[in-house]
């Protein structure tokens, strides 16, 4: 990202995350707050070899960028101690980053892991109006 200073914050964050979700974890090395993501993604890629992140939308307000992704994949490897199930999953990710002078200086992400574990059958789904609750 040598030309990061010429990019708007949304482009910086989208570029970094697109590279990371595409398997290029080296792009995370120089971005504080993204180190944990670099440690977790190889495990996700192993569990979901066909993992895909589909950009949905973003919002920019000053230094802050919010990005919404839809993530999909087929569970073909171990995930947090759970053996492969061959089930397809679809879940959401919302990330908020703060970009200062072309650098990501803060990064927070909320991943829909509960939806993943419901789809894999680990956590039962209970409808909000289910009288059995």
Language-model segments: residues:
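C-terminal and inter-domain tail/linker signature
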Residues: 1-133
